[in-house]
Amino acid sequence: MLGAEVIDLSMLKGHKMLNIDSDVEGHFLTSCAGGMTVDTVIPVTWQKQQGYGAGLTVTGLEGGHSGSEIDKEHANANILMGRVLKYLSDRMELAVVSLAGGLKDNAIPRECEAEIVIPEEKKAELSDSITELEKIFKKEYAVSDPAVCIEIKENGTGEYEVLSYSSMTKVIFYLRNVPLPEGARFISAGIHPWYLTREDYP
């Protein structure tokens, strides 16, 4: 991919390019795949907040290349973290310190980390909620991601810089809804597995 970005196109005479590629040595596929890299900016404000800090990690997912594994319906760690944060915010006062998920733009995110702050007296409820959510995820992804789990790390009581409530709700909404192409766009019912991404398909 990096080489294609700097190739000297002046030596080419054609106007169309066929992708001939495969992960297996000696095998070639003539195919077409599309991808998208999107930079999203969500304006946020910060504030100081006292409370109990904890780290949450959605992990144990299969992940995989967005091309060769896209038909497996693997879970997206970023979307699951959005669900985790929404679940918690509906049940307790929640603030978000940081979020980080995914390593490559052409791979299904297999891990997502969040640093949160909750009232000290909600520690037990946090643990119970995470246990309940993990059971839900394991049931939903029993086939595609059976090892899915949510880890908790204690960061202790103190003052943290967190997203304002309005900023946090925007970020959680974005994670849960992912207003971007996610997963396979179209799978043919007649020819399996055939994935169609042509813009001119009727």
Predicted regions and their residues:
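Acidic/histidine-rich catalytic neighborhood of metal-dependent amide-processing enzymes
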Residues: 1-49, 73, 97, 195
